[in-house]
């Protein structure tokens, strides 16, 4: 955890200690880096009653999320199995962005205003997103950096 964040966290935890147990106040604490939290910070009675870990969606969950985000958008689903296979380890927001970009590809090639996402639109959007994701990973890891 960044050293500058400790005072803020300690202050928040101290304020929580001052609340009466019967107060109608619920705190939801979230982090994507639970590994950085010191267990003793949250271990005091009354601070954290329950911890819930949210994992990345499995194939069935990705299909359900895909259907949810697609809504009533007309789409050729013939390549969906390949998309689901290639999206192992992605978040729900990735899938939402995938559908948004596929719709943009469809809109770019449509003159009559009827939006119909093809399997090629979906594949192109997925390729673009995965390329962006891989480029970001290479940048973060310094791949190709001679120094």
Give the ranges of each region predicted by the language model.
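Walker A/P-loop NTP-binding motif of AAA+ ATPase domains
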Residues: 1-81
